[in-house]
Amino acid sequence: MRGQWGRRPQETIDRANELLDNFAAQLEKRGIRVDRPTPTDFSLPVTTPDFHTDSQFGCMPPRDVLLTVGSEILEATMSYRCRWFEYLSYRPLMQKYWEEDPNFRHEAAPKPRLTNEDYHPRLPV
């Protein structure tokens, strides 16, 4: 998958879903609730008033976006343009949790604009 751009091959999607289904089943056997984000086509381009990128490649690792602490979910912001709308896959779950639990809280960090002036693609990481 290294260096690939655009939609992932269907066989890799199917294999990943099989692995996730098996992992979810193991967790559920232990009494752990498993919720899945809304499927999203991350091969689509992203356009805002400040930038355009041809793909959302790299989206979906929830460990990068969300941190659960008790009944609160903290949402980080993504500094890569291709991941700017990644949070949208999780918003239906946030709504569900809010409806289920009166103590549920969702805190989100401010999103950067990622204009050409403040986004430096060649900055060493």
Residue positions per predicted region:
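The feature marks the mature, well-folded catalytic cores of soluble enzymes
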Residues: M1-V125
